[in-house]
Amino acid sequence: MIKITLKDGKVMEIEEGIKISDIAMKISPALYKKALAAKIDGETVDLMTELHKDSSLEILTFEDEMGKWALRHTGAHILAQAVKRLYPEVKLAIGPAIDTGFYYDFEADFTFTPEMLEKIEAEIKKIIKENHKLERFELPREEAINLMKEKNEDYKVELIEDLPEGEVISFYKQGDFTDLCAGPHVPSTGKVKSVKLLSLAGAYWRGDEKNKMLQRIYGTAFTKKSELDEYLNMIEEAKKRDHRKLGKELDLFSIHEEGPGFPFFHPKGMIVRNILESFWREKHTKAGYQEIRTPLILNEALWHQSGHWDHYKENMYFTNIDDGDYAIKPMNCPGGILVYKSSMHSYRDLPLRLSELGIVHRHELSGALHGLMRVRCFTQDDAHLYMTKEQIKEEVIGIIKLIDEFYKLFGFEYFVELSTRPEDSMGSDEDWEIATNGLREALDSIGKEYRVNEGDGAFYGPKIDFHLKDCIGRTWQCGTIQLDFQMPERFDLSYIGADGEKHRPVMVHRTIYGSVERFIGILIEQYAGAFPTWLAPVQVKLMNITDSQYDYLKKVEETLKENNIRVEIDTRNEKIGYKIREAQLQKVPYMLILGDKEVEAGKVAVRSRKDGDLGAISLEEFIEKIKNEIKNKTN
């Protein structure tokens, strides 16, 4: 008999060699029906996996991220099987699960069309109905290569040949279809209840522009049709809110072929950006942070010393200055460390909180670029805090509260994830344990719920990630708190303790917006371009009905500007209804309409983007109203 510890702490004694699916049935028939995959000692596996030793076990359903992943991974295999049935000459490349579904890349001597997708989708439904079992098997390298050569799958052969010697080479078979895959998968194709193919795109093999362009089919999968329908509605809403579309319509930013991945901010976009950065500075000053600025370009040796060279070299840009090798910074932390090292520190100086709105550059493949969400140049709202081990808990609590204040202001719900030590980490077991426990204790002490994401920490320390949930249910990872014992060691950082001796400080890396550019993109989509008044590039659109109100309009404009209200005027010889519609399309919070009646009464007719016609009021009354709205940062 072996002992199995369940997620709730309950221990089961069961016979050795039992399959996880059978354990799920023993726990509950309802759980067995919903089960998609499992975690054994933190590793995600198939339900058909047999257990031969004492283990911790978590049964995964569609409510769990890795349960979704397993189902959608199987969805990708079903897509590939359907394509091969209909178009046998097509060659298979790769087909992973992704956050919102799955995709599969194909090489074909024809172009897939929307009509073909309908045909493929019909075949997918047949495969689901056939309910084929997914059977995993392993082969030695030569046999695996020969199997894929027999099937004329050149890309699979290349993948196998690139695997390290001794690597397990596994396949999954479902009916008449076999694919190279590490898994895990759901037990049968019938578990994938609802599938929808979403779009077509081009994708270079292995993301390299020098390689062949393949055809990518995107899809998604759910366990219920109602969930799929809800997701498809969300996609339609997301299209309306697409920040790339709204960014152009509202004249906020642009991206040009002369600089792919390098956004250009227009005057209105700069207003939004400057407000966000000013607010950030104000809150950080109150929280005891001191702002610094570090150079864009630093000697290559610095990145070797920090360890970033080993982990980020492929995503860095380089240059040569005076025969020396330099790198454009992909992160702000090494520069911030040099600021710390520039003077001696006492324990009385700690905690020391240094903040920086630092521009960083990271190379992204052209196919991964996406508006402001995925760029090659962005501003990271970093802060690096230096402290004693005893100060970790209180400092982390302070950061969590600051992050919470920011996200609530913008109307975001969020969830928290604690990520633990990855395989390619630096540092001792003891340091990692102290660091992880420090983050865990801070979260526990303020009653903040969190998930544990095993093995997803930074290479230098564990981290807390903050995932925003927007108004249509999508999640965005923005804020992060990363505890770091390694950088202080690598850079020989120290402070003088109360005993007069040198001690090593603990370092915390943290962001709130994450990337300022990306956060702006998220806000554009969160508000569908209709920024709250305090954040709107234009707060008031002032418009006259005829030329006879022009002089009064200019006086009103001047008064609004004197009160620091952002105003634009529309004096074109157009009908007032046309002007109002255009201002509404520009998402302006307030329109002030001036006709002869308003001139005579010394008033303004107010129209709100949100509430419609508010009637005629005095200019003073309107100014008081809008200034209160701006001051209170009303959403």
From Swiss-Prot:
Kind of enzyme, top EC level? ligase
Sorted alphabetically, the keyword list is: Aminoacyl-tRNA synthetase, ATP-binding, Cytoplasm, Ligase, Metal-binding, Nucleotide-binding, Protein biosynthesis, RNA-binding, tRNA-binding, Zinc
Task: State the Gene Ontology BP annotations.
Answer: threonyl-tRNA aminoacylation
SMART domains reported in the protein's UniProt record:
tRNA_SAD
Q: Where is this region: Catalytic?
A: 242-532
| Co-factor binding details | Binds 1 zinc ion per subunit.
Q: What is its EC number?
A: 6.1.1.3
Q: What's an example GO cellular component term for this entry?
A: cytoplasm
One molecular function GO term is: catalytic activity, acting on a protein
Gene3D superfamilies per the UniProt record, alphabetical: 3.10.20.30, 3.30.54.20, Anticodon-binding domain, Bira Bifunctional Protein, Domain 2, Threonyl-trna Synthetase, Chain A, domain 2
> PROSITE patterns under this entry?
AA_TRNA_LIGASE_II (PS50862), TGS (PS51880)
Q: Which reaction does it catalyse?
A: tRNA(Thr) + L-threonine + ATP = L-threonyl-tRNA(Thr) + AMP + diphosphate + H(+)
Enumerate the subcellular locations listed in this protein's record, separating them with semicolons. Cytoplasm
What cofactors does this protein use?
Zn(2+)
TGS domain: which residues?
1-61
Tell me where it mainly resides. Answer: cytoplasm
At which positions is Zn(2+) bound? C333, H384, H509
Biological role stated in the UniProt entry: Catalyzes the attachment of threonine to tRNA(Thr) in a two-step reaction: L-threonine is first activated by ATP to form Thr-AMP and then transferred to the acceptor end of tRNA(Thr). Also edits incorrectly charged L-seryl-tRNA(Thr).
Family classification = Belongs to the class-II aminoacyl-tRNA synthetase family.
Its quaternary organisation is: Homodimer.
Q: What is this protein called?
A: Threonine--tRNA ligase
The gene name on file is thrS
